[in-house]
Amino acid sequence: MNRILGWFAVLVLAMCSATWAQGPETVVTDSLGRSVHIPVPVRRVVSLSASGVECIRIMERIDTLVGITEHTKTRKAQFPEVARLPSVGRGFMPNFEVIAELRPDVILAWKTNPGPELERQLEPLGIAVLRLDLTEPGKLPEEMRTLASILGPEAQKRTKAYWEWVARWTEQIQKSIAVQPKPTVLAEHFTPLRIAGPGSGLYDLTQMAGANNLADDIGIRSMQVDSEWVLERNPQFFVKSILLGKRNAEEDTRRTDECLRSVLE
């Protein structure tokens, strides 16, 4: 009963704040192609993805973050600046009560996760929901520019400088691999023997790096396989993707290595 009353009090406070805080806003297009109205200036942001936190850090607007997910909090080595921020729960299943208590101007979410319940719960409280994946290399520049546009001129300036730097290095890399034979590769998508497929950022990166990815026919962004499947494809290189700062990264690597060696032996 006390929890229900607490949530009701938060709801009333947030709705009152939303009513009194009406003011200037900007309209941006999110990854779903929707027009999203964002109050400006944006001072308080909750990010449901670690990639969102990373992009905000590139823009040097960590000061706007007021809440992150439990997953991001576990990556203290990668994100020491935000480790002390409140957790809003899991990225796919956030705690709406905690989010309402934090009173963000905007919540940053993936394109399709969490589902539409996010908008149903938060938009009546005056909290804008901005859906940007911020993971696919081909879409990342435009999505970062969209995010920077709500975080102010300095964020836009730093985003522009960042992509100019990326473009210079991309050009150099592409020149260096233009005449090289393409090595065959498979890439593991964080979890042991979960292979990255077309449409995933990791798959796209292997293509950009000049490799011939042997998972081009699986038809989905990632697929769980076994060690026999990997050895049948017989890649020259096997790329292990890890999460920086994650406590069990070494354990995941050991498990993958053991799976592959067990078949070879």
Language-model regions, residue ranges each:
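Bacterial N-terminal signal peptides
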Residues: 7-16
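A short, structured surface patch at a secondary-structure boundary
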Residues: 44-102, 106-111, 214
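Alpha-helical, coiled-coil/dimerization segments enriched in small aliphatic residues
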Residues: 74, 196-222
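Proline-aspartate-enriched helix->loop->beta-strand connector
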Residues: 88, 95-112, 127, 227-243
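A ligand-binding cleft/hinge motif common to bilobed small-molecule-binding domains
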Residues: 113-124, 240-263
